[in-house]
């Protein structure tokens, strides 16, 4: 799964990638989503898509990447993670490191 996330981060660089990790039949599965943000250092998921996964799946993590930075959460990440109430998995690319931010 992490390999899929890092591949998505590579494909989207220098923009942030975003997606969801869901539990699917007791397995974790990464779902890449389109980043709707026009800013390269921000991410925005489609709200309808997020709600659809929220209603039909167990979302384990909200995922996004930081390009050419470490994986430390920004103030915006901390605020959004608390608002959503789901852990954030933040990856750095090209360093290929990650951190998990709890709400």
Specify the residue positions occupied by each region the protein language model found.
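Histidine-centered active-site/metal-ligand motif
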Residues: 64-66
């Amino acid at each position: 799964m992490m390999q899929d996330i890092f591949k998505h981060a590579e494909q989207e660089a220098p923009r942030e990638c975003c997606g969801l990790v869901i539990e699917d039949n007791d397995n974790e599965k990464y779902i890449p989503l389109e980043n709707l943000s026009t800013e390269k250092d921000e991410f925005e998921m489609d709200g309808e898509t997020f709600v659809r996964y929220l209603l039909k799946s167990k979302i384990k993590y909200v995922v996004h990447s930081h390009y050419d930075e470490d994986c430390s959460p920004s103030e915006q990440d901390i605020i959004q993670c608390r608002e959503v109430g789901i852990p954030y998995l933040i990856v750095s690319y090209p360093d290929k490191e990650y951190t998990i931010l709890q709400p």
